[in-house]
Amino acid sequence: MILFEVFRKLLLKGGHFPRPLGEPSMSLKLGPAGVPLSCKGRTIVEGMDDITVLGLDAMEVQTVRTVQPHHFDQYWQAGILSWKSDFEMNMHGPYYAELLGSKRERNRTLSKMEASMQAGKLVNARHITYHVGPYGDYEPGGKANEELVNIFSGVVDRVRSIWGDEKEEEEYSAFPWVHEAEPSLVGIETSGRQELWGTVEEVLEVCNHVEGTVPVLNMAHKHARGHGRMRTSEDYAELFDQVRENYGGSKFYCHFAGVEHRMGNALHYTQIKKSDLKFEPFAEFLAEEGDWMDITIISDSPLLEHDAMYMLQHYDKARQRLLEIRARDERKLRLATHHGLDPEELGIDEQEILIPKVSDVDSKHKSTNDISNINPKKTSNKANDMISFEEKNDDDDIF
């Protein structure tokens, strides 16, 4: 049954069979932000079942408003299911935040965040993502970042306190993942508007100073704030090089969706096909240069799981193209080794071989055209149909 389930999931994922030994492998998880639109039920567990059937393996639970006590039972059931499987659960805190506001505004935001921290443990969340909100009375940079370092240090401590101590086995027997997994990572998300704290540089600086945090790269926000910047695979390579140099590590948590933007500000999410932010360049980067990465991508699109599957299909296509290119290069290398040539010399020889062939074909084609262009000799109008040898007819003769 276990083998059957493994092969069933492989087939559903479009043939993601293990690569040969020795070949570097990237860990990629994809899923929607919330219960799938196509799910007949509306509980988290039913949503997880539907996501798995679609060949996806991650989900982000949205706690846009305060978490109610009656939600906790289904959160715990989802946590048990994710612990027993390879399904990744994540949590998103309140969208509206004012961590840089007045003391009253900050405390109100922190009280909302507390509920998502409690739910994060119940659901076995790998990441709990938070927004910071407006700059308030702070200027971008130094002082604001220092304040947030203090705030998120307290948030991380609180998450670890809620997660509990694995030595206290009796108290936490209902949460077996406490003994096997690390506490949830606190994600700090990049923002999509100029008046909101959250450039990539700001997020990286705070994460660098607070252990237990992780930058959440929202590609739609990055694209909008950069006036439509994320257009090529090189743009993504530059972004992840920046993160690797300034933050380190190989684990990444990202959001992706189409976005409508104006003057450096995100207006609202759209489906990927209707946006100038395309997933193909990102897929190309992941396929070509992402072997060192452990990455989770959450679909924020209004189409949720449909665009998550769309992203998975484009990644598979990019990966297939790369494998074809590698196979061609390996074939060229084998031929070069067999003939005692350098691969570059083999490429030149192939061109030299091809050029005469092409010229021969062209000459044959030209000869055929010349023959076909020969005008037939005119016949006499006389009744005996004898060939006319008049001088005007000889002018048309190719001989």
Task: Tell what function each PLM region has.
Residues 7, 99-217:
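Active-site acidic/histidine proton-transfer and metal-coordination neighborhood
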Residues 139-142, 197, 223-294:
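Gly/Pro-rich active-site loop or hairpin
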Residues 273-274, 282-365, 371, 377, ...:
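C-terminal accessory extensions appended to soluble enzyme cores
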Residues 33-37, 62-66, 94-96, 133-135, ...:
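Active-site beta-loop-alpha junctions enriched in small/polar residues
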Residues 39, 43, 69-74, 101-112, ...:
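Alpha-helix N-cap and loop-to-helix initiation/capping positions
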Residues 48-53, 72-90, 117-122, 157-163, ...:
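Acidic (Asp/Glu)-rich catalytic clusters
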Residues 28-34, 59-61, 89-93, 128-130, ...:
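Hydrophobic faces of well-ordered beta-strands that scaffold small-molecule active sites
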Residues 2-115, 214, 324-364, 376-380, ...:
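N-terminal pre-domain/capping segments
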